[in-house]
Amino acid sequence: MRVSYLFSVLLASLAVASPVASPNVSDDVSLTARATEDTPEYAAAIKAHSGLSKDKYYYFTLEWPLGVAVGDGDKETDAELKELQQKLGFEHIGVVVGQVTETETGKGKNKKTKRDFIATLYHMTKKNANPGDTEFKSPNYRANSKQNLKWGGETSKKKAGAAKKAGKDYVDDHKIYKVDGNNCNDFAQTVINAVK
């Protein structure tokens, strides 16, 4: 019994003399928050609707507020614009259709998630003053602080692809611009119906 007692005391003194090593701070594998970077297009889309999900397709309307120039080669006369403004309450309208994406960049501590809304703006302009030909426009959507997206809804990849065809077909069938019956809003409603 004496030997076992001495052996226990010896082990206890060794344990006290050599404490358990504390983890090295540099080896600590704790959870860290990953940095997120939002593009201006994603920020504009999330501002219009907070429930957006990665890899999903969405559509929005984009209105040019009163006093903001349409640009993009539009040749509407001042009288036509004034009449349209009174009828619609805004300068111009288009439809933005696209997909929310998330990509990861960097390594280790520099790892970031980049969120984007890759989309196309579909709208119709008046190509010339006389006779007033319509023109289909489909540039990549770029966020603009003077224009706000308005929530439309969720759509599918197939319907998002059909938006371009619907816009082209509309302009092919409606060649001459008219404030009543063939304006930017009539065009926009046709594109919206294609993506609903």
Please describe what each predicted stretch is.
Residues 1-3, 195-196:
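A positional/structural detector of protein chain ends, strongest at the extreme C-terminus
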Residues 2-7, 11-126:
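N-terminal accessory segments that precede or flank the first globular/catalytic domain
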Residues 128-131:
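Short, surface-exposed acidic-centric catalytic microdomains
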Residues 134-196:
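Active-site nucleophile-His-acid catalytic modules used for acyl/amide transfer and hydrolysis
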